[in-house]
Design a protein with these regions (language model features):
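Hydrophobic or amphipathic alpha-helical targeting/insertion segments
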Residues: 20-23, 32, 145, 151-152
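Flavin (primarily FAD) binding-site architecture
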Residues: 123-137
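Conserved redox-cofactor binding core of oxidoreductases
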Residues: 28-112, 119, 124, 168-171, ...
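An anion/pyrophosphate-binding glycine-rich loop and adjacent beta-alpha core
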Residues: 148, 154-267
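Glycine-rich active-site loop/strand segments that organize a redox cofactor
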Residues: 1-16
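Extended, hydrophobic alpha-helical segments in both membrane/secreted and soluble proteins
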Residues: 121, 141-148, 275
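A glycine-rich dinucleotide-binding beta-alpha-beta segment and adjacent secondary-structure elements
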Residues: 83-84, 89-104, 244-275
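Short hydrophobic core segments
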Residues: 115-126, 149, 196
C-alpha cells in the first residue's frame, strides 16, 4: 500500500496477498520451475520497495517461465480454441449488450473479418507499450481495446497509471527494450551518473527510482545512466542472470567487467476497464 501511495484498491491488494500461496502452489503444479536451494527450499530474491527478499524467480526469465507453462496448460484444455494472428477490431453490440467480437484474421494469404458470437465476453485489454519510444512490451500492443471501450461507452479508470521500469538496456535500435531485472539491483547492482557517482537508493519504489534516473539524465545531458554490477560476484551473475549476461554480451557489454547503459521504459499499464 505504501509503495502505491495508498491509492491502491484495498480489496484487490488483500485478494492478491491472501491468495498468493495458493497461486504459487498452482504454478508449481503446472510445472513452473522456481529456483530452489540445495535442500529443495524455494529461493527468494529482493526487488524495489521490499524490506526483505520475498520474490520467487527462475533465473532471470521468470515471466517467460510462468507464461510458457500456463500456455501449455491452456493448450491441453479440450474446450479452448486458440486463434493466432487474429486481431479484434470491434464489439458486436445491441441494446448495450455485448454478443461477441469482430476479428481480422491475417494468417491466410487474404486477410478477412470473422465474427465470434459469445454469450459472455471477457474484456481483457492488455498493454499499451507500442505507443512509447521506450517500452518492454511488444510494439503491436497499442491499446486498441481501450479505444473500443471508449467507443462503446465502457467505463475506464486509472488510465494515467502507467508503470515505468527504471532499468532497461539503452539502445538506439527500434523495437522493445530489453529488461534489466529489478532483482539485479536487489542483488547489489548500483546506479551511477556520468561521473561514476551513485545518486539514488536503487531499491526504492519503481516510480521513485525512474524519476531519479530521468532527473540525472537531464543533469548529465545523457540519454541514459550507468548500472554497475561490481558488487555482485561473477558466480551469482552467471547463475542468477544468465540471459541478461548473454544478451548484454551480444550487445557488446560484459556485465562482469563493466557497467551498462540503462534507461527507464514503459513496462506495465495499471489502469483499464472498471471492474
Amino acid at each position: 500500500m505504501r509503495a502505491g501511495h495508498y491509492e491502491n484498491r484495498k480489496e484487490s491488494v488483500d485478494i492478491m496477498i491472501r491468495s498468493s500461496r495458493e497461486i504459487i502452489d498452482d504454478l508449481i503444479g503446472y510445472g513452473v520451475d522456481f529456483e530452489r536451494d540445495d535442500n529443495g527450499h524455494l529461493r527468494f530474491t529482493r526487488e524495489g520497495a521490499h524490506s526483505t527478499p520475498r520474490i520467487l524467480f527462475h533465473e532471470d526469465i521468470t515471466g517467460k517461465e510462468i507464461t510458457s507453462k500456463l500456455l501449455a496448460q491452456v493448450q491441453k484444455l479440450p474446450n479452448v480454441t486458440i486463434l493466432e494472428n487474429t486481431e479484434m477490431v470491434d464489439i458486436v453490440e445491441q441494446d448495450n449488450v455485448c454478443y461477441g467480437i469482430v476479428c481480422r484474421v491475417s494468417k491466410e494469404a487474404m486477410p478477412h473479418l470473422i465474427t465470434i458470437s459469445a454469450k459472455d465476453t471477457v474484456w481483457a485489454c492488455g498493454g499499451i507499450g507500442g505507443l512509447y519510444t521506450h517500452s518492454t512490451n511488444f510494439p503491436h500492443l497499442t491499446g486498441d481495446a481501450l479505444a473500443l471501450s471508449l467507443r462503446h461507452h465502457i467505463e475506464l479508470e486509472n488510465i494515467d497509471y502507467i508503470q515505468i521500469h527504471p532499468t532497461t538496456l539503452y539502445s538506439e535500435k527500434p523495437g522493445r527494450r530489453f529488461l534489466i531485472s529489478e532483482s539485479v539491483r536487489g542483488e547489489g547492482a548500483i546506479l551511477l551518473n556520468r561521473k561514476g557517482e551513485r545518486f539514488v537508493d536503487e531499491l526504492l519504489p519503481r516510480d521513485v527510482v525512474a524519476r531519479a534516473i530521468y532527473e540525472q539524465m537531464e543533469k548529465d545531458d545523457m540519454p541514459y545512466v550507468h548500472l554497475s554490477l561490481e558488487n555482485i560476484d561473477k558466480k551469482t551473475i552467471m547463475e542468477h542472470f544468465p540471459n541478461i549476461y548473454q544478451h548484454c554480451l551480444e550487445e557488446g557489454y560484459d556485465i562482469t567487467k563493466e557497467s551498462i547503459p540503462v534507461v527507464p521504459a514503459q513496462h506495465y499499464f495499471m489502469g483499464g476497464v472498471h471492474v
